[in-house]
Amino acid sequence: RGILDLGYLDYSCNWGTHIALLYDQDSELLDFLLGVLHAGVITKDRICCLLPASIERPLLDAYAEKYPDNLASLKEPDFLQLSQDEHTSSFFNSNDLLAMSDLIDSLYYESQIDTPRAVRFILDIQQVLKGALTPRELAEIIFRINLAVCSKDWLQISLYDLRLIPATHLMSALEQNRFVFRK
């Protein structure tokens, strides 16, 4: 455990941190994600992303253009894990928060088996909201994520598209986050 380079400006934070990133333009989001992704590549962290395809493909293309020498690292199966929409509902289920915590634990401990690696997990909250959650249910999910990651070498970044998220959901979720960036 220790301090990690966030890959965004000159920010650093402790492992076990959950950061909310608020944005309203995809180009701003890509700049932030490129830095986080590259910092994870440099330190050989496991990177997991639950992003919509509209962000995922441009992110990988922009990374290939900006960091062509490091692109091979992203193609290693244990290095970058991209999960699509169908996995999101089973992973972030407000009806079974204990199972969600267990899935986070198993993902983390799987990354420790051969070569221990820290985890950088990027979650687009819109993927979670497809389950038609109430603001309170979203806040509970964020709270559970915080509990699950606080004792691990895990950086959790939750993305909030201000163009899409209802204000009541945003405020409920942000009450659970200690760190909020506005891009």
Which residues does each predicted region cover?
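Non-catalytic regulatory/interaction regions at protein termini and inter-domain linkers
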Residues: 1-183
